[in-house]
């Protein structure tokens, strides 16, 4: 069955067509399917070319969800550090060090905004080439993989940059202040993304469609799963849905390391981003939680429970217990 974009009144935005099992399949795969169904010759299946072109734009919409959060949070963490008395000189030096540490394979330091702009231009060119039949199916699929890879490299370095800044927070102010820092900068994110799940306003059952869809959409945007294409493991239980990521492309990759580029765990040198050393309520009462992963507890469980007595989702994260330990390597589960 063809995959296309449609409007969701429940969510208030355009979404991908398909049942829940289909939503667990990466948008990259769906673009490839539509391209192959369309073929290289203009004719009856021309609409499948248009479907695939629109899905390329939607791939960028998924990526945007993550890019904007990373952009807003990274700036917020830095503003918080300045408010706590860190000098601009010290902060700029640390960010510059991290940008060099996150250099691309060709040695180019991380510069997020120019990379995002270039990604948008490349994706737009791909969509136009698909629509106009200027690209064969084979050429379009090859270019799609280039777009995906460009986003993966930018995504991963942006996640690492945030993890590095959070490690700087811990070094300067101690582990307990991570919670203070997160709470200070997450409010716009909570308002935009999670206030619709306030059960004082809307019964939980009526939010399930939105909750599950935006979870799958965001994790496709993170490019989770084998080969970093955005494929998700989705299980329907009698009383709940379970989604798993192998790997989670942010915190899970921070703990495991990056097989795509052959680099090691960000807990270890040369990164040394660290993990939670003292069990706390906002770290699932566990040690070994990466600093980045703690936001999932705060945003999805702790803060919603404080405000309306009910979590948005529950999370069972991987825990650092050393390289290759099963707890480190396990799937993240929501």
Residue ranges and their predicted role:
Residues 1-295, 299-333:
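N-terminal accessory segment detector
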